[in-house]
Amino acid sequence: MPMQTTRRDLLTRSAAAAAVAALPPLRTAFSQTTPADEGPGATDLQRDLEEAIARHRVVGASAAVYHRGEIETATAGILNATTGVDVTPETVMHIGSITKTLNTTLVMQLVDEGLVDLDAPVLDYLPDFAVADPEATRAIKVGMLLNHTSGIDGEMIPDHGPDQEAIRKAVERARDLGQLFAPGEDCSYCNTAMVVAGHVAERVLGDSWYSLIEDRVFGRLGLQHSVVQPQDALLHRASVGHFLDPATGTQQRTSQAFLPLSFAPAGSTAMMSAPDLLAFVAAHLRGGEGLNGERLLSEESSKAMRTGTAAVQGIGAVRSFGLGFMLGPNDDFGHGGGGPGILSWFSAHEESDFAMVVLTNSAHGGLVAFELVNAWMKKASGFEPLAPQRFPALDIDIDARLYAGVYEDVAAEHTITERDGRLSVSSRAKVAFYDTTSTDPTPAFPLDPVGEHSFVVSLPEAIAATAPQTLLSFVNPQDDGRMRHVSTGGRLYLRRSG
C-alpha cells in the first residue's frame, strides 16, 4: 500500500525537501511475501515498540494488535516533550487521514439505510455544491468522493480562521477549485472530496458531522477514548505532535495542534487511542460487526469498502483504492494519517484475521509504524504490506521533451527541467501547513529512469541509503506526446506549462 503513504515522498527525504513535506501523508510501499509462521505471539510487542522508538528517535507511540480474537497493546515514550507525561493505552493521538475511513463508514451507513446512492450526483444531496467547472459539478457522483476519482484539485486549502472553519464553509470554497481530470476519468488522492462527502452526511441527516461520528461510529462500537471535536481532547490524556530538528537533534513540539478545522472529515481533528482505532478496524475485519457485538454497518457495505474500485497510475504508489480504504496486492487494506508532527498507520488482512494499529506523535513516526506493521503482519500473514521495493536506475535514452514542464495542484508544484540530456525535479509547497514546511523551492534533484516514463529521484547518498525511493511516473500522453500528468505518492499533478 500509501500515500505519503501517507503525502510527501520527496518532501520527507531531507530538510531541503521540506516544501513537499507538508503534503498529506501517503507512503510509497509494496508487498513482499514469505510463508507465515505460528503467528505474532512469537514477538513481544512492548519490546518491539520500545526498541523502535529509541532507534528512530520518536517521542511517543501506541500500538495495538488484533489476531484471531486476541488483542495485545503496548505504549512507549511520552505524549508531550514539554510535559514529559507518559503515553498510556488510553492516550488519544492524532489519526490524521485515517479519519477518511471513519467518514466513509458513516456515508456507507446511509447507503445501508437507503438514504444515499453512491451512483447519484452530489447535487442530488447538496443542491448548492459547485466546483469551478460546471460540467464537472454536474458529473461528480457520491462514490467518486470516496474513491478519489472526482478529479477535484483539492489537496488542501489554507486556514481561514476560526470564524470561517465550519465544514460547510470548506464546501462553499470548493467552487473555486479546478479539475485535475474529468470526474471518473482517473484517480488522485483528494482531501476536499472527503470533506464534501462528510457534508453530504450532515445535510441528509440534519446533524453535525462531529455528532454523527460520535454517535454512529464511536457510540455504536462503545469507544471511550476517541474524539473528533478538538475541545474534547482536553477531557482525555492527549498527545501532541513533534518535529525532530536535524541540526540539533532535539524534539520540537508543534506550534499548531490541528490542521484547518473545516477539513475534519478528511482528517484534521480526530484523535483516538490505539485500542479504540483497532476496535474500529476489527469491525471491518468482522464484516461490519463490532467486538462489542453491535453492528457498525452491513456486511455488504463493509466488503464494498475493501473491494477495489479505482487503480492508481504509475509505479511506487498506492496500488488501488476501495471506498475509503487503501488496498494492497494481498487482499490487505489499510490507511495512513499525517498531521502537524504526527504519522500513524494501520493495516489489516481478512484471511489472517489480523489487524495492527501504530500511532506516533513524531513527523517521522512512519519509520516506527512501517517497521512494526511489516514485522507483525509477516508473522501473521506471511507478507510485509509496507516493504519498499527498490528500482535500479536504467541506462536508457529518454526524450526530455515529453516530460519537462511545471506540474502542479492547488497545494504543490513540481518543476521538471532538462540539462545535458538528464532530467531533474525541484518541488515547492504553496502553503506552509506545518512548522517545518518551507514555501521555497527545493534544490533540483536529478531523475534517473527506472522504467517506461518512470523515474527515481536521485537524493544525496546519506539520505538515499535509508529512505524509501521517491518515484515519479509521467502518465496520460497528450496528442503531441507530452505527458499531461506526473503521478507520485498516490496523487496526480497537472502539467500547467512547458
Residue ranges and their predicted role:
Residues 2-4, 9-31:
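N-terminal export signals
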